[in-house]
Structures are given as structure tokens and as C-alpha cells.
Amino acid sequence: MDKYIGKRLDGRYEIHELIGQGGMAYVYRAYDRIENRWVAIKILREELSDNSDFLRRFRNESKAIAVLSHPNIVKVYDVSFGDRIQYIVMEYVDGITLKQYIEQQGEIKWREALYFTVQILQALQHAHERGIIHRDIKPQNIMLLEDGSIKVMDFGIARFTQAETQTMTDKAIGSVHYIAPEQARGGHINDKADIYSVGVMLYEMLSGQLPFVADNAVSVAIMQMQAEPTPPTRINPSIPKGLEEITMHAMEKNPAQRFPSAADMLEDIERFRRNPEMVFNYGDQVDHAYARGTSIYDTAGSRQQDYNDNYEYEEEYVRSRNGAKASMVGAGNVAAVD
């Protein structure tokens, strides 16, 4: 029997059930007797309590999320780094991972894929503006709630852009199918590495396939650095050309050729949403908005308002979910634990 189930941590958190586990931590559903709410508690494995690298990663997660406050990022409520037990108390998210949803659905309709992508990018924009790079964006780290809202989680290997030191373990870390080429080679990274990972997820949602697959992680990493992905329209011809361009632009090998920021990618998604027939021709379009140093919107605030006013993707999502809602009921999940 699990030694934590039935126990109360710090006289406050009643642990009810194990809902996830990985190489670094266990995640439990617990009830907060003070705030009268369900929470998720991530507890570091005892055998890792003396491992400085895992301790740093574990504590870094709470440190990173503590400076973030966004509806699309899992909240941290409390932390405890004692001698006997180390844990993080987080928002309890009852849903499934985006990876599970992709596996259930196969190819995802492009409007729905964009509905998810916009929320992910808004979360990353919030993090990047505060100097935090996630570095492990993948559908396993994205929670999907039944109403279609997205929660980005697992900032365990996030890095502050102003950090003075970066170990070799830091440089090469991430999930090989989604990491940027510069991550794969252990080079310097910035927020454009997260943009690349979003591009890979969008590719996977639209085509139902990962851009690079091989027998081992090293081979996939080499492909990330050297191979060109099959254009997603060759796999799914129903993908609009402009959306394919957005996807491939996010996945450029050279970080300097990607979207400069999450905000810029959001901007072009909005342009495409308003006119799904448009194409971007990123390779030779010299008057693109970010090349001019201007925006198609007067202010960032008005841009954000456009995203929030009447997002048509939500209607598409609700319609598509009507036939699949049962697959999410009872499939509660919370955070990836590594």
C-alpha cells in the first residue's frame, strides 16, 4: 500500500489517490482542508532527495511557475522543501493530455488545432515576457479540459533567460521528438526553441504524424538537426496552404528564420483565421509585419482582445467534442511528472 494515501501533509493536505508517476516524482490527488479544494501534489521520490540535479529541477519548477499567472498555465499554490519530504501543491486539472487526445482522434481539424495552439502560445508569450523558457513543450505536457481549455504544465526544466550558468545536462535536455535543432546539438537556446516545439505539435495535430520518427532517440535528434520534414499537406491534403506555411515557419532549422516570438506567431495565426485563403511566402516576403518592426494591430492589448472576442475555433471544438466527450469522462489526469 502506498505510504502517503490516507495521510495528511502538514496537517492540511489529505492525500486520496495516486494519479501519476514518473522517474522523478509521484503525483497525488489531495484535498486542501484550509482552502476546501482539490489539489494535485507532486512529491519527489525519496531515492532522489540527495540527487542535486533532480533537486534543482524539482525546485526550479515551483520557482518558475511562481512568477507566472495565466489561465493557460497550471498554478502552484504551495511548496515544501523539508528534510523528510519535498512537494509542490498545484492546481488540480481534470482532463487528458493533448497527446492522448491526438492518439484518440488521429488528424485533428485545423480550426480545432489552432484553437489549442493559440492557448499554448498565449501561455508561452506570458512566460517568455517574464524571462522563462519552458524547454520541454510537448503534447504530454499540455492538459486538455473537457471545455476545450488548455493548461501548460511541467516547468521542471524551464530556464530563466538571465541565468548565468547552464550545465551540459541543461543544454541537451528535452523530449527528442519535439526539441529544436539547437537543443539537440546542445547549443545556446532562447524562446525560439519553444516556438519550434509548438510547430512540431501543430504538425502532429494537423497530419496525425510526428515529423521525425526513428528507431532510437539519437537518430531522431540527428533528423531534427539535419532532415527536412515532409510537408504536412502531402499527408493531409485538406490542410490550408497558409496554415502549412505557419507550421513550417515555426519549424525552421535556423532559429533566426522562425517567428521572432510567440506574439508574432499568434499574429499570423489571427491573419490566417480571418482569411484562410491567404499565403505568407515567408522565404521572400520582405514586407512581413515583424520584418517592418510593426504590427497589424495598434497595440498588444487590441491584439489580445481580437483573440478573446469571438473565437470561432471554440464553436468548432464544441461541435467536434460532442461525439467524443465520453472518451474524456473519467479519464482524469494531471501533470506529467518528469
Over which residues does each language-model region extend?
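Protein kinase glycine-rich loop
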Residues: 16-22, 27
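Juxtacatalytic C-terminal regulatory tail of Ser/Thr protein kinases
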Residues: 260-335
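Protein kinase catalytic-loop region centered on the HRD/HxD motif
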Residues: 120-132
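Conserved short submotifs of the Hanks-type protein kinase catalytic core
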Residues: 83-97, 101, 105
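Activation segment signature within eukaryotic-like protein kinase domains
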Residues: 116-117
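AlphaC helix of the eukaryotic protein kinase fold
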Residues: 45-67
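Activation-segment/catalytic-loop signature of the eukaryotic protein kinase fold
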Residues: 79
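C-terminal lobe helix-coil module of Hanks-type protein kinase domains
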Residues: 177-280
